[in-house]
UniProtKB/Swiss-Prot annotation:
Keywords: DNA-binding, Isopeptide bond, Nucleus, Phosphoprotein, Repressor, Transcription, Transcription regulation, Ubl conjugation. Disruption phenotype: Mice fail to undergo chorioallantoic attachment and labyrinth development and die in utero due to severe placenta defects. Belongs to the ETS family. GO terms for molecular function: DNA-binding transcription factor activity; sequence-specific DNA binding. Residues 433-453 have a biased composition (Acidic residues). The lineage of its organism: Eukaryota, Metazoa, Chordata, Craniata, Vertebrata. Phosphorylated by multiple kinases including MAPK1/ERK2 at THR-529. Phosphorylation regulates the activity of ERF. There is a cross-link at K467, K483, K514 (Glycyl lysine isopeptide (Lys-Gly) (interchain with G-Cter in SUMO2)). Expressed along the osteogenic margins of the developing calvarial bones, in a similar distribution to that observed for the master osteogenic regulator RUNX2. This is ETS domain-containing transcription factor ERF. Residues 251-268, 362-373 have a biased composition (Low complexity). The gene is Erf. It holds the Pfam family Ets. One of its GO terms (cellular component) is nucleus. It comes from Mus musculus. Residues 130-169, 184-304, 342-476, 495-551 are annotated as: Disordered.
Amino acid sequence: MKTPADTGFAFPDWAYKPESSPGSRQIQLWHFILELLRKEEYQGVIAWQGDYGEFVIKDPDEVARLWGVRKCKPQMNYDKLSRALRYYYNKRILHKTKGKRFTYKFNFNKLVLVNYPFIDMGLAGGAVPQSAPPVPSGGSHFRFPPSTPSEVLSPTEDPRSPPACSSSSSSLFSAVVARRLGRGSVSDCSDGTSELEEPLGEDPRARPPGPPELGAFRGPPLARLPHDPGVFRVYPRPRGGPEPLSPFPVSPLAGPGSLLPPQLSPALPMTPTHLAYTPSPTLSPMYPSGGGGPSGSGGGSHFSFSPEDMKRYLQAHTQSVYNYHLSPRAFLHYPGLVVPQPQRPDKCPLPPMAPETPPVPSSASSSSSSSSSPFKFKLQPPPLGRRQRAAGEKAPGGTDKSSGGSGSGGLAEGAGAVAPPPPPPQIKVEPISEGESEEVEVTDISDEDEEDGEVFKTPRAPPAPPKPEPGEAPGVAQCMPLKLRFKRRWSEDCRLEGGGCLSGGPEDEGEDKKVRGDVGPGESGGPLTPRRVSSDLQHATAQLSLEHRDS
């Protein structure tokens, strides 16, 4: 089993996967990538590069093989690994760098800092890489507070030491204090402590060289809430040696040798990181609290770990999940600044729901509309439709007026009722027997031959009723077979050209009779002028043909 000292990561139990548990899915791929980025032996395989949070996979096959070994999947390859990395795109954990092969970038600004592991931070002797993640501080630490405040840890037990080494309690506690002083009075908070237990502006050189007393803390260490080894992973990693491969820079506070702020990573923002970005106003050094711990000793910025403070602390952690889009490095929690709680969005939609419900019955009953008139939206009536509203207003108005005797509403309704009946006449005119139509048309054609078209002047007398007939004639013509329609048109064209097709005169007349018979007698009152012209042309061509035969 891999020891915590080998990894150097402060994973909790749910995020740490030892190699001795095959098939376990507790470790995530991006946790594993952070592990590889921190180890010196894998610098030729994967390394930080380029912009802030960016890393390049130099040997994709080797990274996939290592991931397969870790997950007990020997068939792992880079294709499967890249699909797993693409899964993190929507999670806003990392994304692919465009234009660069095998290059990805962690979204440390968008990451929910509660969800990614805190990389153990030591004294980096070398230069900080440009792509290093942000400096973790009071609010951005990977912390898991104790589940119950009843778990009490003795102040002499070193939470960062193995349980076997906790026998000499006083020496271990002194070592903890000395180690914290050596890294600039900053705690990684994985041991359940807060970095604000120590004064921010105090010069570490003013402290005695020996083991510091308990009075060096602003509050008694007995007030610290404990942590369970099941909740926090205990790491006995020494803090004295330099860690040039750590992606985090040196402590954000002043080191033992100077009072000036340290040199930060060039990828960090310009906001003052020496001020603790904490999840609760009580943790902020600007919080004007009068008392310190439960014993009353200490300055104003002491986090006493009282039940009230812990309640606010846990509430702030749950709130950070809802406000994950806010960067904890760029959002200072001031005492006067009120951050909306997670339950407020549930209350916000309630006020608009009240005015939305009354307008629905307002259209049905006048009493409800009068009661809800002050809450009615101006833009709500138009979506109902102007025609529907007009019809709704006319319907009750017409009934009232008809009962009163005015009759104006009845006329409007009558006009609306008269409009639809026009289609029935078209249906009644269509069914006409062919025999009757042929007989009628035969007599008409015989009259044309005898009286030279005189008979067509008498039917023109009634022009009033045939007005709807022009709409009927095309409808009847559409019902006519295409063959007869084109034959009739061809015969008329031939007649207009001057008798070029008179060789089959009787047959054409017979066909024309059939076509005219299909049209029906009702058409005689409609298109009279073209039929008269065609008859005149027919007689003229007949006379010309007789003259040619005689000659």
